[in-house]
Amino acid sequence: TGWEAGTEMAALRRLVNYWGSGYDRRAQEATINALPHRRADLDGTPVHYLRFDGEHPDALPLVLTHGWPSTFLELVELARRLATPTRHGGSADDAFTVIVPSLPGFTFSPQRPSLPPAAPTHELWHRLMTAELGCTRYAAHGGDLGAGVTTMLGQSHPEAVVGIHLLAVADPVDVDPGSITAEERAYRAAVAAWFDDDGGYEHQQMTRPVTLGYGLSDSPVGLLAWLVEKYRAWTDSDGDLSRRFSDDFVLTQASLYWFTNCISTSFRPYYEYARGMREPLSRVTVPTALAVFPHDLSQPPRSWAERSYHLTRYTRMPRGGHFAAHEEPQLLGDDITEFFRDLR
């Protein structure tokens, strides 16, 4: 009983029963179909994305990148706020034209060919923003896996990326142990403790993703159990997921994974990272903001981020968790807006 060993049976049974009789799949499909979907072919790699045009003629282009276990759907409310700020009490001068791509292997973006030689995701995003959409300057935001993509955009293309806004940061390389502060040591210890207690999923997805994928691709109940445990644990919900995610939202997320058969391919970034199939991190020189939500997986101190990034803004949020764009779109949207206001 309870959630200590994983997804609680009673909670899962209730969701499964609603999924089978009560959940209006057609209504959710209609909502998804009404979104501004686009598709690009980037040198043979198809990429799905949403485009929300900014309400100002000089709106700054902004690419938002989701993480795991997320989809484009999680970013819709945030994107709307950023594209049309006057509808939410803001100024049209702060508008962005917002691009929300689906990561390769997630929902409507098929998995890339095995790496190498396929282009890494951040290079696909740069092609999307420049060659496909014609942007010469653009901004970027991401959390979780999306923070990694956004970091690499800032590192690789400072000539085009005006700044990056992150919900997580990469660990610095070649840290002198003698330079680590007490606050940084406490942070690293907290991360290690979290991994020991809650990181089993990550180890499995890093090491044997295909084996796990067979089971989750064969059972919608198993897939839902794998996802909902993370949604409950990683939100600022005090154990009551319905405070943050409605049943319809949870089941629509699960349905997107199920009907596009993408759960196995969504593990691919973990496998690639574990095998060094990513470009190494060097110092990111573009202006960087970090927003730290108290119920996210980790809360890096400012000094830790400053080791690898040109950090010009650091915000400790009063509430919110790992899925900040859906949990707290106003808090996150305001922080993004304020950060990029002087970088336009």
Outline where the language-model segments fall.
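The serine-hydrolase catalytic nucleophile loop
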Residues: 68-80
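Short beta-strand element of the alpha/beta-hydrolase
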Residues: 59-67
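Alpha/beta-hydrolase active-site loop signature
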Residues: 69, 104-107, 171, 321
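Conserved hydrolase catalytic core segment
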Residues: 81, 85-87, 132-184
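Non-catalytic accessory segments flanking enzyme active sites
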Residues: 1-58, 249, 258, 265-279
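Glycine-rich "HGGG/HGxG" loop immediately N-terminal to the catalytic nucleophile
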Residues: 73, 88-90, 94, 99, ...
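C-terminal subdomain of alpha/beta-hydrolase-fold enzymes, centered on the catalytic histidine
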Residues: 205-344
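Alpha/beta-hydrolase active-site loop
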Residues: 114-132
